[in-house]
């Protein structure tokens, strides 16, 4: 079975892309970020016609997350969580559910991590505070759910291999020491970066700036991740960044990242 994450940068604009990609990939669970739509206009019916259910938390213009699940291979989720508990936040950045699958019950957490804007600013402080609370939440969830996957746009490139020009980015947002330390903190809970379970070629990224021909020049970063618990780690058969949707007309600046169990 396949689990994937994709920052679609507006579901209203990118819905045809999502539907086309689901049709060809037959992904079982797809986590989406940056919906940029409110819940009342979420495309429940369109997705249902394709055989997908969804849980979601949206807001106008910004943020928003969803988990789509293929109804013929995955049961409807239980124990749904919207946003981080005990963290007052109007921004819709997290949704979680427990899904019964062919690989057993999987606690699936979809997150749109704060960008942080610029090192040292208020948005950066918010990002670090959010990451601290996320770590506490994931630690608690791991105690209840042996099979756990944390999928999303992390807005963190874990190390220099994940940046097209490390020297140019050094110390900046997405790669600052504090952000990378927060990523390592998640790994220290017992999670593994599914992408690094395999030998990967150099220069593989999940996001490219729209400006300056970023995609065409492969000036990108790997900031979209799927971390898996030890119980899931042994079941991961492959991990692949699918660049195809980034080549379509009016694409998201991100592309799907997929693992297969």
What is each of the regions a protein language model found here?
Residues 70-71, 97-103, 229-230, 252, ...:
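Active-site beta-strand termini and strand-to-loop segments that position acidic
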Residues 61-78, 214-235:
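Conserved beta strand-loop-helix elements of the APE1-like EEP
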Residues 1-10, 105-120, 151, 254:
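Active-site-proximal beta-strand elements of phosphoester/diester hydrolases
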Residues 1-49, 60-65, 158:
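N-terminal, active-site-proximal structural segment of metallo-dependent hydrolase catalytic domains
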Residues 50, 130-223:
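Metal-dependent phosphoesterases centered on the DNase I-like endonuclease/exonuclease/phosphatase
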Residues 35-38, 42-118:
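Structured beta-strand-rich core segments of catalytic domains in phosphoester-bond hydrolases
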Residues 240-261:
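Surface polyanion/phosphate-binding segment centered on an Asp-His-Pro turn
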